[in-house]
Each structure stands twice: as C-alpha cells, then as structure tokens.
C-alpha cells in the first residue's frame, strides 16, 4: 500500500440512497485495510435537495475534504448532480453517472433550464472514462426502484478490481436488512455487468 490518498465524490439528491452507498464504500475499503475519512453535506436532503459525500481512502488520511479539482472518481446518482461537480474532477477522473433526471424546483418554476446532454459534456472531457448507467430502470426491472443505488455501486466496483465481489456483498449483508439481501445482490451484479457492456 503506497502513501497515495484516493478521492471519491458521491453526489445525488435526497432519497436516492447516496449516503447508504457511501457507507457501503466505507465498509468495503476499511475491510480492505485502508484508512477512510468521509464527510457528508446535505442540502435539504429530505426534500430532494442535494446530498454530497467526500470520501477519501489511503494508508493514512488526515482530512475528509477533497480539494477542488482533485476528485479521482465521481459516482453521481443524478445527471444535474454530476454536472454540478464536473470541475471537481481531475483530468484523469473516472466517472459513473446514473441516467436519471430529477428536476430541481428552480427548473419547475421556470427560473433555470436543465442542461442538455450532460453525458455528452462529460464524454468530451473524460473520453472513455465515463460510464452512464440506467440505474433506476434496472432496479425497476428487479422489482424495487430503491435498489438503484446498489446497481450504481455494482457498476462503480469495476474501478477497483483488486477488491473482490465477496467483500462488496459482505458490506451489503452487514448494512441492509436480511429480507432485501438477495434483491441487492442481484442489483449489484446487474450494475457490474452493465458497466462492462
């Protein structure tokens, strides 16, 4: 293990399960022997406000906050929330974006326009390192839209081949009620597969 600290930013909208996803990551990376620090910033999370988690891991991490322009990995649960943090990403950043639009109140009130073709904008700057996943759609096919966050975690896990699937599934087992284990194992597998297609 070298001294490098890796920075992951998770961004989403309240109710999408972004915080649970960051807890899954924390569980996995601690189990893999890393020091982990994370910091959550909630807008009006319960009302569909933004939710952002700064997540850092390495041999020794001193601060949970990621500097502007220093994100190695972005996991975005909603298109506009991805766009909001595009400038936080390093030039070599790797990105997973959920292909879902949740219109903020300002758009609904006609005060702002929702940006067009957000995935295209990301591809222009991070060519070949942007993976757009239909997390919501895939979770619905499995029978529960709430599993979209685990679909995205499954896709995101592809960036860390050194961490075996068993570790990710162990985190799901420890953090989720038993009655939804099987659903979430399937959601994880589907996300992992969708990333590779």
Question: Language-model segments: what does each one mean?
Answer:
Residues 1-197:
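Active-site cofactor/cluster-binding pocket
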